[in-house]
């Protein structure tokens, strides 16, 4: 039976769970808002991990940058705790990035809703024109 996930995917998934808990429990920096870890991409050699986050509530570019700065400065602290909890021989270096897919998805949903509303409006005006 073949493995469903590669080792890097399994480690990335576990890192995502562990980091979410560590950030919630251990990081006391006020610059870190309500952070959600959306994905962790681990390199094949397990040397680096890109941690993608979203910041709930405060979605201004300044708030996002402050959260990223705080998390990147706490990366070595988080890496140390990850090493203890995950029992890996070498823990990847953490690089935090803002995940724009959520905001892009919200923007696309708004565009779709607006297009549907305009289509309904045109349909209603066309029906009224044909009745007259």
UniProtKB/Swiss-Prot annotation:
<dbReference type="GO" id="GO:0043024">
    <property type="term" value="F:ribosomal small subunit binding"/>
</dbReference>
<keyword id="KW-0963">Cytoplasm</keyword>
<dbReference type="InterPro" id="IPR020053">
    <property type="entry name" value="Ribosome-bd_factorA_CS"/>
</dbReference>
<comment type="similarity">
    <text>Belongs to the RbfA family.</text>
</comment>
<keyword id="KW-0690">Ribosome biogenesis</keyword>
<comment type="function">
    <text>One of several proteins that assist in the late maturation steps of the functional core of the 30S ribosomal subunit. Associates with free 30S ribosomal subunits (but not with 30S subunits that are part of 70S ribosomes or polysomes). Required for efficient processing of 16S rRNA. May interact with the 5'-terminal helix region of 16S rRNA.</text>
</comment>
<dbReference type="Pfam" id="PF02033">
    <property type="entry name" value="RBFA"/>
</dbReference>
<dbReference type="InterPro" id="IPR023799">
    <property type="entry name" value="RbfA_dom_sf"/>
</dbReference>
<dbReference type="InterPro" id="IPR000238">
    <property type="entry name" value="RbfA"/>
</dbReference>
<dbReference type="InterPro" id="IPR015946">
    <property type="entry name" value="KH_dom-like_a/b"/>
</dbReference>
<comment type="subunit">
    <text>Monomer. Binds 30S ribosomal subunits, but not 50S ribosomal subunits or 70S ribosomes.</text>
</comment>
<dbReference type="GO" id="GO:0030490">
    <property type="term" value="P:maturation of SSU-rRNA"/>
</dbReference>
<dbReference type="GO" id="GO:0005829">
    <property type="term" value="C:cytosol"/>
</dbReference>
<protein>
    <recommendedName>
        <fullName>Ribosome-binding factor A</fullName>
    </recommendedName>
</protein>
